[in-house]
C-alpha cells in the first residue's frame, strides 16, 4: 500500500501548471460564458454591454495570471537585479486591447465575440481610460513598463492609485470646464488588491535623539494598501507588476485621544487620511507647493521603499541567514529610477532607513543610496522645478529635513574642496535655497544622491550640462547621460493602426514589432508603386474612420480629403498653440482676400487640457473655439478650412487621431520641450512633421534627413542671441502686415463680437511679455506651411516622404530607450528570450 501523502506533497497539487488556459475560440467562448454567469452573475436577458466588456476582460485576464504567477516565481528563484521605476504618474489608457495584442489573443477573441453576436470594437470602447497622468511624463512611464516586460527585465512600476485621474474636459460656451474622472465607478478588472501587503506610512511627529541615534516619534500613521496590475511583455510570456498604493486610515485613527461623543467624528475623519490618494494634481510642467501633494510624494516613496527592502531581505540568495541583513549587495540587487523629482524623497528616506533603522554608518549608507538611485530630468522650465518650503518639510517630515541638511553639509564640503574660495558656487549648488521663504531644491537633492542623471533627448541633455546643472556637471561629469525618449510600437502602431502594421508586415515580416530598427528595410520600397498605394490607402481609411467618429461623437462634419493638420498635447504657452492659431487666421484672411483662388483644403485640429488654474492656457482654448466659430460658419470659406477643438484629449483619443494625421505640429520654442513623444507617434503612423529644432525633433530630422522634415524657426542659439539683444514683439508687429492685421482683429473683437475685449490678455501677453517669442517665428512658420501645402498637392511625393519617415522612426522605440537605461544606468542585460508558458515545464 502506498504511504499517505504528507501535507507538503498534497499542496504540490496546488499549481498553476494544471490550469493553463487553452487559447482557442471554443475555450474563449466557454470562459466568457462562465465569467458572465459566475463572476458577474448575469444572464443574457439582463446583461448590459458593460457586462459583456467585463466578461471579455476577465476572460483575457485569465490568460495573464498564469504567466504573471510564473514570472514572479521565476524572479524569486533566479533573484535577478530588480528595477524599480518610481513615478507619481502612469498614464496607461485602456488595457484590454493592449493585453490581447501582447498575448496574441486578438484574432481568437474577435472571432469568439463575433460568434456570440457581439462586436469587439464596441466592447473595447466601453473601457475607461486609466488616466493616472497629465501628459508626456506619465505616458512615458506606461511605455517604459511595456518595454521593460518585453525586454525581460525584472521591473516594477510603483505609483499611486488615484481615485480620480486627470479631469474630464468639457467645452461649454467655448470654455474648458472640468469634471471629476470617476474611472473606478464600475470597478477595474485589471487590478488585484493586496491588503495582506498593507504598510504603514508616517507623517508629522518629532525627532528624539537617543544614545542609539535619532528616533522619529509621535507620528500620524496612514496605511498604504497595494493594488497590482499585470504588465505583459510582447509575446514572451513575461508579466511584470505595476503596484499602485491606495491610502487607508488605520482602525484606531483619531481614536487614541478619544473624547466623549468623538467616536462618530473620528470615523468620519478617516477621510482626511484617505484623501492622500484621492486625486491626481492636474499640473503639467508647473510646480504647485501644496501640502497634500508633498504627502502624496512621500506616501509613494515610503511604502515603496519598505516593499523594496522586504523583497531584498527575503530573497532566496545572497547569504546563509534566513534573511539578508547586510546591505553591501543592495545596489547589486536593486536599481531605483526616479521619474523626475516627484519621488526625490526616496533619497532621504533610504538614508533614514539605513541609518536610523538598519544602523549603518552614514558614509556606508550614502554609498549604498547613491549607487542605487538614478534621476531622470524632464524639464528646464523654471516654474516646473520643485522647490519645497522648508517649513512644510519640517512639519510633515522632521527627520527627513535633518537628513537633507546633513546631506547638504557634506555635499558642500566636497564642492568647497573641489573649488576652493568659490563662495558663489556654494550658494548656487546648495540643496537649501535662502530667501524670503527657505526652500529645498529637489533637483539638487536628486543629483547629489544619484549615480546617474539623464535628460530625455540629446539637445535637452546638452542644455542641462550647459545651463541649469552646469555647476553639477563640472563637479561630477561622469554622472550625466542622455537617454532619448521612445514609445512602445505595440500600442502606438500594432494596436492603434493595424492597417499600417499589416502593410508593413506584408513587406518585411512581423519581427519589427519587437525590433523597430527593422523598419529601415522599408527604404527599399520608397519607389515601389504598390507599397506607395497601400500606405496612402491605409491613411485615407484612417481619415475616413476618424471623420466618422467626429461626426458621431461631436456632430461635426469635415472634409476627409483635406490635409489633417494636428496639434494635440497639453495646452501651455511654451508649446505655442498660439503660433498655430496665428497661422489659421492667416489662412482665413487669405481665403477672404482672394475667395476665388485655389487653396489646399485643411482641417486644423487642436486638442489638449489646460491646468484648471492656468488662466492663459484656458484663454488659448477659448481663442481656438472662437476662431472655429468664425471660420466654420463662413460660407466664403466652405470646406477649404475647418478648425476643430478636440475635446477631452486622452490616450484613447490619441489612438484614434494620430493614425489619421497628415501633418504633426511640434512647434515649441527651441530649448523648451525636453523631448516630446507625441512627435514620435505621429512619425511612426505616417504623418509628416512641421517643427522647430527642439527636443527629439532634432534627432527625428537627423534620422529621416532634414529634406524629409518641415523645419522652421530659431535654433537654441538664435533664441539665446535674441534674449541677449532683447525680444521686442512690436518690431514684428510693425514690420509684418499680415501679423499686424491679425493682432488688430484680436484686439477689436473680430473673433468675439459680443465681448470685444475677450482676448485682451492674449494680445497684451504677445505684445509685451511673451517668454516664448511667438512673433519671432511667425514668418518662417507661415512660409514653411506653404511648402507643406505645395507638397500635399502631389500625393505620390507626399507618400514617398511619409515612407521615408516611417522607415527611419526605429530609433524612437522605447525598447531602444530601455535597453540603454538597462545597460548604462541599471547594470542589467535585456533579453528577448521567452519565458516558458504556464503549461510548459520550466
UniProtKB/Swiss-Prot annotation:
Domain of life: Eukaryota
Gene Ontology MF terms: glycogen phosphorylase activity; pyridoxal phosphate binding
Modified residues (N-acetylserine): 2
EC assignment: 2.4.1.1
GO cellular component: cytoplasm
Disulfide bonds: none
Residues reported to bind AMP: 43, 76, 310-319
Keywords, sorted A to Z: Acetylation, Allosteric enzyme, Carbohydrate metabolism, Glycogen metabolism, Glycosyltransferase, Phosphoprotein, Pyridoxal phosphate, Transferase
Summary of subunit composition and partner proteins: Homodimer. Homotetramer; to form the enzymatically active phosphorylase A.
Family classification: Belongs to the glycogen phosphorylase family.
Purpose of the protein: Allosteric enzyme that catalyzes the rate-limiting step in glycogen catabolism, the phosphorolytic cleavage of glycogen to produce glucose-1-phosphate, and plays a central role in maintaining cellular and organismal glucose homeostasis.
Protein name in the entry: Glycogen phosphorylase, muscle form
Organism this protein belongs to: Ovis aries
Taxonomic path: Eukaryota, Metazoa, Chordata, Craniata, Vertebrata
Amino acid at each position: 500500500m502506498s504511504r499517505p501523502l504528507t501535507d507538503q506533497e498534497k499542496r504540490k497539487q496546488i499549481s498553476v501548471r494544471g490550469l493553463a488556459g487553452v487559447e482557442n475560440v471554443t475555450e474563449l467562448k466557454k470562459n466568457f460564458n462562465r465569467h458572465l454567469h459566475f463572476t458577474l452573475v448575469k444572464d443574457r436577458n439582463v446583461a448590459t454591454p458593460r457586462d459583456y466588456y467585463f466578461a471579455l476582460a476577465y476572460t483575457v485576464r485569465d490568460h495573464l495570471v498564469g504567466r504573471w504567477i510564473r514570472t514572479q516565481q521565476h524572479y524569486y528563484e533566479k533573484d535577478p537585479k530588480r528595477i524599480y521605476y518610481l513615478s507619481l504618474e502612469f498614464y496607461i489608457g485602456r488595457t484590454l486591447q493592449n493585453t490581447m495584442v501582447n498575448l496574441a489573443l486578438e484574432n481568437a477573441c474577435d472571432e469568439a465575440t463575433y460568434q456570440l453576436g457581439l462586436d469587439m470594437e464596441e466592447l473595447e470602447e466601453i473601457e475607461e481610460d486609466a488616466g493616472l497622468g497629465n501628459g508626456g511624463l506619465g505616458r512615458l512611464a506606461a511605455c517604459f513598463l511595456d518595454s521593460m516586460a518585453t525586454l525581460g527585465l525584472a521591473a516594477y512600476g510603483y505609483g499611486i492609485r488615484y481615485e480620480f485621474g486627470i479631469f474630464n474636459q468639457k467645452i461649454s460656451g467655448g470654455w474648458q470646464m472640468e469634471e471629476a474622472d470617476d474611472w473606478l465607478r464600475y470597478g477595474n478588472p485589471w487590478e488585484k488588491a493586496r491588503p495582506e501587503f498593507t504598510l504603514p506610512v508616517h507623517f508629522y511627529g518629532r525627532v528624539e535623539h537617543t544614545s542609539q541615534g535619532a528616533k522619529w516619534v509621535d507620528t500620524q500613521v496612514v496605511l498604504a494598501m497595494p493594488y497590482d496590475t499585470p504588465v505583459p511583455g510582447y509575446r514572451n510570456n513575461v508579466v511584470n507588476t505595476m503596484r499602485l498604493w491606495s491610502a487607508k486610515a488605520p482602525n484606531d485613527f483619531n481614536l487614541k485621544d478619544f473624547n466623549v461623543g468623538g467616536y462618530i467624528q473620528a470615523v468620519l475623519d478617516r477621510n482626511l487620511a484617505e484623501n492622500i490618494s484621492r486625486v491626481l494634481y492636474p499640473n503639467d510642467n508647473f510646480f504647485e507647493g501644496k501640502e497634500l501633494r508633498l504627502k502624496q510624494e512621500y506616501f509613494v516613496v515610503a511604502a515603496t521603499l519598505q516593499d523594496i527592502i522586504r523583497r531584498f531581505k527575503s530573497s532566496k540568495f545572497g547569504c546563509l541567514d534566513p534573511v539578508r541583513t547586510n546591505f553591501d549587495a543592495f545596489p547589486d540587487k536593486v536599481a531605483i529610477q526616479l521619474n523626475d523629482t516627484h519621488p526625490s524623497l526616496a533619497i532621504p528616506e533610504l538614508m533614514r532607513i539605513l541609518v536610523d533603522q538598519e544602523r549603518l554608518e552614514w558614509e556606508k549608507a550614502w554609498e549604498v543610496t547613491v549607487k542605487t538611485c538614478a534621476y531622470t530630468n524632464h524639464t528646464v522650465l523654471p516654474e516646473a522645478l520643485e522647490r519645497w518650503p522648508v517649513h512644510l518639510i519640517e512639519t510633515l517630515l522632521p527627520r527627513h529635513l535633518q537628513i537633507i541638511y546633513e546631506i547638504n553639509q557634506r555635499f558642500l564640503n566636497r564642492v568647497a574642496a573641489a573649488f576652493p574660495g568659490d563662495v558663489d558656487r556654494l550658494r548656487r549648488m546648495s540643496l537649501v535655497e535662502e530667501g524670503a521663504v527657505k526652500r529645498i531644491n529637489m533637483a539638487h537633492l536628486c543629483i547629489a544622491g544619484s549615480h546617474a542623471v539623464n535628460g530625455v533627448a540629446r539637445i535637452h541633455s546638452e542644455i542641462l550640462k550647459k545651463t541649469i546643472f552646469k555647476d553639477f556637471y563640472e563637479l561630477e561629469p561622469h554622472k550625466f547621460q542622455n537617454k532619448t525618449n521612445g514609445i512602445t510600437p505595440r500600442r502606438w502602431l500594432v494596436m492603434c493602426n493595424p492597417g499600417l502594421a499589416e502593410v508593413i508586415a506584408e513587406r518585411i515580416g512581423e519581427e519589427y514589432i519587437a525590433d523597430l530598427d527593422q523598419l529601415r528595410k522599408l527604404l527599399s520600397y520608397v519607389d515601389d508603386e504598390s507599397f506607395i498605394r497601400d500606405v496612402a490607402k491605409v491613411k485615407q481609411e484612417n481619415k475616413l474612420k476618424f471623420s466618422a467618429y467626429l461626426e458621431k461623437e461631436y456632430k461635426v462634419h469635415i472634409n476627409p480629403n483635406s490635409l489633417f493638420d494636428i496639434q494635440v498635447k497639453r495646452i501651455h504657452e511654451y508649446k505655442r498653440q498660439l503660433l498655430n492659431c496665428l497661422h489659421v487666421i492667416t489662412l482665413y484672411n487669405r481665403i477672404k482676400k482672394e475667395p476665388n483662388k485655389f487653396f489646399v483644403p485643411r482641417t486644423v485640429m487642436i486638442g489638449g487640457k489646460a491646468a484648471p488654474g492656468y488662466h492663459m492656457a484656458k484663454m488659448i482654448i477659448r481663442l481656438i473655439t472662437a476662431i472655429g466659430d468664425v471660420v466654420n460658419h463662413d460660407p466664403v470659406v466652405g470646406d477649404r478650412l475647418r478648425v476643430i477643438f478636440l475635446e477631452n484629449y486622452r490616450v484613447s483619443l490619441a489612438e484614434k487621431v494620430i493614425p489619421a494625421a497628415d501633418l504633426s505640429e511640434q512647434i515649441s520654442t527651441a530649448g523648451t520641450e525636453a523631448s516630446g513623444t507625441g512627435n514620435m507617434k505621429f512619425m511612426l503612423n505616417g504623418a509628416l512633421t512641421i517643427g522647430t529644432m527642439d527636443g527629439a525633433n532634432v534627432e527625428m530630422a537627423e534620422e529621416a534627413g532634414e529634406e524629409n522634415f518641415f523645419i522652421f524657426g530659431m535654433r537654441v542659439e538664435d533664441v539665446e542671441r535674441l534674449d541677449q539683444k532683447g525680444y521686442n514683439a512690436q518690431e514684428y508687429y510693425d514690420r509684418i502686415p499680415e501679423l499686424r492685421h491679425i493682432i488688430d482683429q484680436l484686439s477689436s473683437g473680430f473673433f468675439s463680437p459680443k465681448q470685444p475685449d475677450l482676448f485682451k490678455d492674449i494680445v497684451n501677453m504677445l505684445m509685451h511679455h511673451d517668454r516664448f517669442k511667438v512673433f519671432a517665428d511667425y514668418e518662417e512658420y507661415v512660409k514653411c506651411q506653404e511648402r507643406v501645402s505645395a507638397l500635399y498637392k502631389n500625393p505620390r511625393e507626399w507618400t514617398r516622404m511619409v515612407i521615408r519617415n516611417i522607415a527611419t522612426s526605429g530609433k524612437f522605440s522605447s525598447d531602444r530607450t530601455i535597453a540603454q537605461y538597462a545597460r548604462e544606468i541599471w547594470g542589467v542585460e535585456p533579453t528577448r528570450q521567452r519565458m516558458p508558458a504556464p503549461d510548459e515545464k520550466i
